[in-house]
UniProtKB/Swiss-Prot annotation:
Keywords: Repeat, RNA-binding, Transcription, Transcription regulation. Belongs to the RRT5 family. Residues 21-88, 170-256 form the RRM domain. One of its GO terms (cellular component) is ribonucleoprotein complex. SUPFAM superfamilies: RNA-binding domain, RBD. InterPro entries: Nucleotide-bd_a/b_plait_sf, RBD_domain_sf, RRM_dom, Rrt5_RRM1, Rrt5_RRM2, RRT5_SRSF_SR. SMART domains: RRM. Residues 272-299, 314-355 are annotated as: Disordered. The gene is RRT5. It comes from Debaryomyces hansenii (strain ATCC 36239 / CBS 767 / BCRC 21394 / JCM 1990 / NBRC 0083 / IGC 2968) (Yeast). GO terms for molecular function: mRNA binding. Residues 314-324 have a biased composition (Basic and acidic residues). This is Regulator of rDNA transcription protein 5. Pfam families: RRM_1.
Length: 355
């Protein structure tokens, strides 16, 4: 005689006589700890601490059945959980891939000893879209193989990806801004919230998509740090779906890991400046380079003029020395000539005196 699991909000199943005091719990919140689950199940006197977050073992089969009856479909940490008796895995030797089919095309699901039957109660059928936690419709009685019901935990990788990342209290992320967006546009968009820092960048996914899909409009990502932390949620609520440069943008709190990644990249590529980091354009860089070249040219021209003056001065001194006697200055020579002329005029001619 098979052991019947008590009625649950979803369906009734029958185990094939294998008694188990362990229950399987699915759809727990990813942040649930062992301590929280133990407190949740405390009144049912679990025999051991629940290992992981999927199984809990109790002192008896009756107690485990009571847990299934009371807690299947209950809310725990704002999520509906699904509880059923644990069924140990027993390999049947069937091939992993492919299933044998009957002549009518229906799948042959194994021996009767390995089947579990849905309840035959049809007086109050469930709605057509109601399904159990394994995705099997419960409105029509049918047989299913135990192996078709997954009892293992969800892959660790999926759980790790769904774990919430730490979010910033003052920085907003925009992932779909128009490619031509510049610092001035972003500051104008957030002017009522006094943005203190703006980063505009293109992520790896955006670069990859724009290389492969030429018709797709190019986009950039934006990080905006606000002056006050309390303005974060208000800015997201009021500006979300508003247009920035003609495109509706979607805002959310930035991940701290993304902020750190962008800031480190900016430190490597940015030119030191006292002003907040902005996006440098090719025109600005060309203008700055042109100014530096002009300054260097002016300096060289002044040096050339100074050298030319020095050379001209030395050349002039050399010419004057070659023309003028070296021992008598020019002024003294002129004075001697003048005195000689005066002497000749003042002395009488000797021939005239004799006569």
């Amino acid at each position: 005689m098979s052991l019947v699991i008590p009625e649950s909000p979803m369906f009734e199943v029958a185990n094939n006589g294998k008694k188990s005091s362990r229950v399987y719990i699915k759809n727990l919140h990813f942040n649930t700890s062992e301590e929280e689950l133990e407190v949740f199940l405390k009144k049912y006197e679990p025999r051991h601490r629940p290992f992981g977050i999927a199984y809990a073992e109790f002192s008896s089969v009756e107690q485990a059945s009571k847990v299934v009856k009371d807690l299947n479909g209950a809310l725990f940490k704002d999520r509906q959980i699904f509880v059923k008796l644990h069924v140990p895995f027993s390999p049947t030797g069937k091939p992993i891939f492919g299933r044998r089919k009957t002549s009518s095309g229906a799948e042959k699901l194994g021996d009767a000893s390995n089947k579990v039957n849905l309840s035959a109660k049809t007086d109050k059928p469930l709605s057509s879209d109601t399904k159990d936690f394994d995705g099997v419709a419960s409105t029509v009685p049918r047989s299913i193989n135990i192996e078709d019901i997954p009892f293992t935990d969800e892959p660790k990788k999926v759980q790790d990806e769904d774990v919430q990342k730490k979010l910033s209290n003052d920085t907003i992320f925009i992932g779909n801004a128009v490619d031509k967006t510049v610092d001035k546009d972003v500051r104008e968009f957030f002017k009522d919230y006094y943005p203190t820092q703006v980063f505009i960048f293109r992520g790896a996914n955006q670069k990859r998509m724009q290389r492969t899909i030429s018709l797709r409009q190019k986009t950039v990502s934006v990080l905006v740090t606000l002056k006050k932390e309390e303005d974060l949620s208000k800015a997201i609520s009021e500006l979300n779906s508003k247009k920035l440069n003609g495109r509706a943008v979607y805002l959310k709190a930035a991940h701290l890991s993304k902020i750190e990644e962008v800031v480190n990249a900016a430190k490597i590529t940015a030119v030191p400046s006292k002003s907040p980091p902005t996006t440098a354009t090719a025109d600005d860089e060309a203008q700055e380079q042109k100014g530096n070249t002009t300054a260097e040219t002016s300096t060289l021209l002044e040096m050339f003029k100074d050298t030319q003056k020095k050379i001209q001065g030395k050349y002039k001194e050399t010419i004057e020395k070659q023309i003028r006697p070296s021992d008598t200055p020019l002024g003294e020579e002129e004075e001697e000539e003048e005195e000689g002329d005066e002497t000749k005029q003042g002395v009488p001619n000797e021939e005239m005196i004799v006569a």
